[in-house]
């Protein structure tokens, strides 16, 4: 009885610690970005605040990676991979919906990441309100006379505006790729109409219209209405590879290393997604801004990693699927063992191997992509600066 009470007490403290960790991480992330370059306008301030949330996600996944390797090599149990209990607060909150007991081994890890990210998100929301109150002058909107347009005129104007943005942001290849993917996804949905997987396939099909829908719904001048249309190519790529090629064409089973390839690609796509979001708020017109954009792109990728694993956990929890691969038992020929060895032969970690394998693959491609983004931004800035200098020199000579 005393042992159960002690375990419950430790569990409650762990919940509090993880949440506070998310709060502190978000605050430090915001202060760090402000230190690199103090925000001069509301867009830069917004980016710095959102960066705090991304730092919370990065801290969540990096701590879990650290605990995994300590357990892997030392044979400890920091991740509580043997936790199998129906008394957990998550079960009390939503019930034991899952049908696969193997998922319970990932419960503590996903709980920690969820609480840390939740702390970061709540802190970010509070900071958004706080900085808006503190910096009222930055958020004063210039009132413009609004012309009263009929729905037809408004729709015509909106269509022409969005068409111009689309053609500016994207190439013919991007647009062709979108529609080809939508066509094959629609065909797959029709074929799978009576299967449970059809719901997920339909959701992924809708996701290929995400950026377009965002531009239509949100008014001109808002943050969401300025997101680069090329971000839709990133979403469509991951949907095409994961949902259509992986699940419908069944490449997960046909091609042995397809999952490895997909997670390597996801690291690149997440960095580029963060890059396009940052460009919506900050112009790459200085070296400090290049650092800010690159830092946000990296943090965004590290935020998506735990968020993705949590979404897989919730999906497995509700529908009894096996997205997190907790059934996987590694062999001596496993790529993970070839790279890191067998460690302390900690068999309780086996259900967690697939999750950390996926995360590590994404990290591998995130780092070089971040370096590429920074180098390309600085080279563009230097090129623009040299062009401006040569223009000034020509004007001086003429004078």
What positions do the PLM features span?
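Bulky hydrophobic segments
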Residues: 1-323, 332-399
């Amino acid at each position: 009885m005393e042992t159960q009470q002690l375990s419950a007490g430790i569990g409650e403290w762990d919940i509090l610690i993880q949440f506070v960790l998310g709060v502190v991480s978000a605050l430090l992330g915001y202060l760090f970005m402000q230190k690199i370059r103090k925000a001069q306008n509301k867009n830069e301030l917004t980016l710095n605040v959102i960066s705090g949330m991304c730092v919370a996600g990065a801290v969540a996944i990096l701590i879990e990676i650290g605990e995994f390797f300590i357990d892997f090599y030392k044979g400890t149990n920091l991740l509580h991979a043997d936790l199998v209990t129906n008394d957990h607060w998550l079960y009390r909150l939503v019930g034991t919906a899952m049908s696969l007991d193997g998922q319970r081994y990932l419960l503590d890890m996903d709980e920690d990441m969820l609480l840390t990210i939740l702390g970061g998100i709540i802190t970010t929301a509070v900071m958004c309100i706080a900085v808006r109150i503190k910096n009222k002058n930055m958020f004063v909107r210039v009132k413009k006379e609004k012309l009263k347009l009929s729905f037809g005129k408004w729709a015509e104007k909106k269509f022409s505006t969005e068409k111009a943005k689309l053609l500016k942001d994207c190439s013919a290849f991007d647009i062709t790729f979108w529609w080809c993917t939508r066509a094959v996804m629609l065909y797959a949905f029709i074929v799978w109409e009576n299967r449970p997987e059809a719901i997920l396939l339909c959701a992924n099909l809708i996701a290929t219209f995400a950026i377009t829908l965002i531009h239509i719904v949100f008014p001109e001048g808002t943050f969401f209405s300025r997101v680069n249309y090329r971000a839709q190519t990133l979403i469509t790529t991951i949907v095409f590879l994961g949902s259509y090629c992986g699940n419908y064409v069944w490449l997960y089973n046909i091609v042995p290393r397809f999952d490895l390839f997909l997670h390597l690609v996801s690291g690149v796509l997440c960095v580029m997604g963060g890059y396009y979001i940052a460009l919506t708020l900050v112009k790459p017109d200085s070296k400090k801004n290049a650092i800010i954009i690159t830092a946000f792109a990296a943090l965004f990728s590290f935020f998506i990693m735990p968020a993705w694993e949590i979404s897989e956990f919730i999906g497995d929890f509700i529908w009894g699927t096996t997205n997190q691969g907790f059934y996987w038992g590694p062999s001596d020929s496993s790529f993970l063992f070839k790279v890191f060895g067998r460690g302390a032969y900690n068999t309780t970690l086996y259900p967690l191997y697939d999750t950390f394998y996926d995360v590590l693959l994404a990290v591998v491609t995130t780092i070089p992509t971040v370096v590429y983004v920074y180098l390309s931004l600085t080279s563009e800035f230097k090129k623009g600066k040299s062009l401006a200098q040569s223009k000034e020199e020509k004007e001086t000579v003429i004078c």
